[in-house]
């Protein structure tokens, strides 16, 4: 019985006076939370940079595809043109040369 009392007293003293790691573990948990928040922000910034680079690359590829595609909505040779109806690439929108009574400009071949 004396042995049990001695162990109980020893257990009581060790739990009340003993140094617990609760404060240390709470501080470590807080530090880990702060570090994980910082690392998450850094990771997010890196992902945004990668995404921006990919979007730029995709945009450039789309522009190249558009450059190779057929030209749309352009006016042909000797057809009236204005700000709404543009001439095709190899044509230019000019006033008719010998006729002053035409009211609009026409698409002509570019002079070399």
Curated annotation (Swiss-Prot):
UniProt function note: Probable ion channel inhibitor.
Keywords: Cleavage on pair of basic residues, Disulfide bond, Ion channel impairing toxin, Secreted, Signal, Toxin
UniProt tissue specificity: Expressed by the venom gland.
Disulfide bonds: 74-88, 81-93, 87-107
Protein name: U15-hexatoxin-Hi1a
Lineage, uppermost ranks: Eukaryota, Metazoa, Ecdysozoa, Arthropoda, Chelicerata
Compartments reported by the entry: Secreted
Annotated Gene Ontology cellular component terms: extracellular region
Top-level division of the source organism's lineage: Eukaryota
Propeptide: 19-73
Species for this entry: Hadronyche infensa
Keyword Hydrolase: no
């Amino acid at each position: 019985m004396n042995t049990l009392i001695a162990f109980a007293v020893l257990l009581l003293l060790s739990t009340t006076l003993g140094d617990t790691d609760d404060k240390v573990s709470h501080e470590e948990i807080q530090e880990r939370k702060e570090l994980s928040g910082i690392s998450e922000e850094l990771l997010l910034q890196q992902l945004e940079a990668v995404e921006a680079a990919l979007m730029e690359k995709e945009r450039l590829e789309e522009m190249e595809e558009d450059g190779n595609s057929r030209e749309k909505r352009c006016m042909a040779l000797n057809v009236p043109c204005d700000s709404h109806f543009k001439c095709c690439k190899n044509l230019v929108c000019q006033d008719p040369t010998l006729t002053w009574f035409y009211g609009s400009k026409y698409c002509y071949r570019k002079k070399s």
